[in-house]
Amino acid sequence: MYIEMIDETGQVSAQMQEQITELLQFAAEKIGKQNKEMAVTFVDNKRVHEVNLEYRGIDRPTDVVSLEYKPESEIVFDEEDLLDNPELAEMMEDFDAYIGELYISIDKAREQAEDYGHSYEREMGFLAVHGFLHINGYDHYTPEEEAEMFGLQEEILTAYGLTRE
């Protein structure tokens, strides 16, 4: 999985970015999405508030904003077209590869790590996996969805070694 890391704050270390990249690659393998691409942008509360307002109509900062990429129009090709034209098949794979982007507020991550009594690294990892699952179709609107999504994110974090301390 290719993950573009963007640090708009200048405060997220290369080591932290690498750890989150590895964690998301691990999560991608866990749910069978290894051949996908995404972006993670680290921002402050002011910027995440702007993103929330622009894309979700939410007038406040949140810890993570997940923007799932959905093409405006679906391009449909007959399977024979793809078999006859390897270049077209490759182009379609690339087209389908980008799944979305995350905006993680480092301010909220610090606040929540302190509030929950665990490390900043654990909180950043939690937010990354939580957002990643959202852009892959997981949600927590119903108790059943919540149990599935939260169970999976805890399973991923624990298997990776990011437990609550």
Swiss-Prot record:
Species of provenance: Streptococcus suis (strain 98HAH33)
SUPFAM superfamilies, per database record: Metalloproteases ('zincins'), catalytic domain
Sorted UniProt keywords: Cytoplasm, Endonuclease, Hydrolase, Metal-binding, Nuclease, Ribosome biogenesis, rRNA processing, Zinc
PROSITE patterns according to UniProt: UPF0054
EC number of the protein: 3.1.-.-
Protein known as: Endoribonuclease YbeY
PANTHER family: ENDORIBONUCLEASE YBEY, CHLOROPLASTIC (PTHR46986:SF1)
Keyword Cell membrane set for record: no
GO cellular component, one term: cytoplasm
